[in-house]
Amino acid sequence: MSKNNPPYLSKKRDASINLNGKVSDCNGEIIWCRHIASYWSEFFCSNSGKIDYETFSSPQLLSKAIVIQENKGTNNIKGDVFFVENESWGSVIYNLFLQLEKENKSHTSLEVHSPGHAMALGIKIKNDKENKFVINFYDPNQTATHKRVFFCTNNICDIINLTAYDFLSEQCLKCYGLKEDTLSLF
């Protein structure tokens, strides 16, 4: 990846907010990373690739927004599942952008599962004076923000060079089980 274009957190949002495992839904079930990542992914897709972090910043709003249905996840899995090595995240993301272009779609999202954590990726093609390929990486342990990186048409091939290490710190890689097991499920 270009050293001039690393994923970054928005300065407009509070990266210290962590509601993972700290709030319950209306039925008293604890809301974990898998629930938050799934909700973020659905929110991203249903709002043209945009996220309003008001809900993700508030324990009360998040507990109202997410209703846990444990059986639901197994019935709503998308058709494609990828086992991805830490060094190969960019290849999968690049191919998803190519698929979006081919299908004339502007955005999609997918959940990312490691042995110890669930996260999400939102990708979108932003059509302005220069097409931008935008990647949003969401970690529920930073509930009210996401990391963002974009590439222009002239450097889209640089996406292939993205790795898990570009999005996650050494500490997170270890905590999420990605140091010992270098595969994620997309």
Predicted features and spans:
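Active-site nucleophile-adjacent alpha helix/oxyanion-hole segment immediately C-terminal to the catalytic cysteine
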Residues: 1-70
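Ser/Thr- (and often Asn-) enriched beta-sheet segments in non-cytosolic proteins
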Residues: 16-18, 109, 134-136, 182-184
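A general structural signal for short secondary-structure junctions and capping/turn motifs
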Residues: 23, 111-112, 127-128
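Conserved active-site-adjacent core of cysteine acyl-enzyme catalytic domains
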Residues: 43-115
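Short, surface-exposed coil-to-beta transition loops
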Residues: 114-120, 130-133
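Short beta-strand micro-motifs enriched in acidic
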Residues: 122-126
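Catalytic Cys-His active-site segments of thiol-dependent hydrolases/isopeptidases
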Residues: 127-150
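Noncatalytic regulatory segments and standalone regulatory/sensor domains
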Residues: 143-186
